[in-house]
Amino acid sequence: MGNNVVVLGTQWGDEGKGKIVDLLTEDAKYVVRYQGGHNAGHTLVIDGQKTVLHLIPSGILRNNVKCIIGNGVVLSPEALIKEMSGLEERGVPVRERLFISEACPLILPYHVALDQAREAARGKKAIGTTGRGIGPAYEDKVARRGLRVGDLFDMASFAEKLQEVMAFHNFQLEHFYKVEPVSYEAVLEQAKGYAELLTSMVIDVTNELDAARKRGDKIMFEGAQGTLLDIDHGTYPYVTSSNTTAGGVAAGSGFGPRHLGYILGIAKAYCTRVGAGPFPTELFDEVGDHLGTKGHEFGATTGRKRRCGWFDAVAMRRAIQINSVTGFCLTKLDVLDGLKEIKICTGYQMPDGSIAEVSPMAADAFENVTPIFETMPGWSETTFGAKTLAELPQTALDYIKRIEELTGVPVDIISTGPDRNETIIKVHPFSA
């Protein structure tokens, strides 16, 4: 039985993880975020009501679930408080359900200023970050100058550390990027305002999760972004600044890796990508427009239009290798309704004429790659809202089976709409 389940994206993010986490948390006691920051955008639709979460784990709407923000997450106090307020206005008792690791690095206003100044300076070579300070906060963590949630317990010491790090970053902002420096006094006053709230939510996350495991409590680890955006294994440099893969779970939460059970890979029935970077199966025709319009492909965090393309089994094989995926959840199957034919990328023809069955890693290696497609018949029937396999047309079942054959991994869950009830569960991860 998979008591400890990891839910992560196997593409370039935006795969529909939030809905699936919310659905599966009916059986969980804990939901843990282990990487990323408020650059994530997890959309939940419950009985028609839409909720978008950026930082708080997607289990927060369940009254039986403890939600934890692990040490691998870079935490923006401003974003957290805004998100908490929105939920509390709707009657969600966030403070009773949400807990934070004291080792979470803080995202502060100078990180945001740096992020935006750098993207502007890159011009046409911009990476396409969300501009929310995620990358600079991770840089400070690795450089060992970052401030953490635990530093807020001693504000005198915090003020000294803040002054030192801001002198360093303001020098860059003024003299290299030629923009206004960030006010030290303003940042310090801001920090004094939220220190009590954040420190009141701190727990020993490793100890809490280990005790939960020993009790047999079900724990879910919620990934943000997607495998192909991983800082180490993604299409570098067009990646995020954290480990979005299964390997990030242990490092970003302090939970022992040997105790992880089922790895659920979330994948759209087609592919999307936000921002710059390689995308071999990208469509520039009316089919791409159809996917974008019908799939409402606009980022939950940035509002940016997503690039759309066919399902890429080559990139998926790389994601499976990295994450040791147990089973897939295939989302947005209904977006393919009405297409006469559907294509799957089964290989890449490389510039030297060789055929790659697993995608390269660095972005440069994707240059002049030609996708090799297999064409399958589409279906005219609607799959929207289907709750059983019997409701799916045979051609849709054939498409799902072909994905299983090409990847070697079973599709255990199929999502046919945004609501948590619009789902077909063949194998439940907590029962696998």
UniProtKB/Swiss-Prot annotation:
Manner of cofactor binding, per the entry note: Binds 1 Mg(2+) ion per subunit.
InterPro entries per UniProt: Adenylosuccin_syn_GTP-bd, Adenylosuccin_syn_Lys_AS, Adenylosuccinate_synth_dom1, Adenylosuccinate_synth_dom2, Adenylosuccinate_synth_dom3, Adenylosuccinate_synthetase, P-loop_NTPase
Coiled coil (UniProt feature): none
Enzyme class, broadest EC rank: ligase
Annotated IMP binding sites: 14-17, 39-42, 130, 144, 225, 240, 304
Pfam families xrefs: Adenylsucc_synt
The EC number(s) this enzyme carries: 6.3.4.4
SUPFAM superfamilies, sorted: P-loop containing nucleoside triphosphate hydrolases
Catalytic activity field: IMP + L-aspartate + GTP = N(6)-(1,2-dicarboxyethyl)-AMP + GDP + phosphate + 2 H(+)
GO cellular component: cytoplasm
Domain of life: Bacteria
UniProt KW keywords: Cytoplasm, GTP-binding, Ligase, Magnesium, Metal-binding, Nucleotide-binding, Purine biosynthesis
SMART domains in the record: Adenylsucc_synt (SM00788)
Cofactor(s) needed by this chain: Mg(2+)
Reported function: Plays an important role in the de novo pathway of purine nucleotide biosynthesis. Catalyzes the first committed step in the biosynthesis of AMP from IMP.
HAMAP family (alphabetical): Adenylosucc_synth
Protein name per Swiss-Prot or TrEMBL: Adenylosuccinate synthetase
Source organism of this protein record: Vibrio cholerae serotype O1 (strain ATCC 39541 / Classical Ogawa 395 / O395)
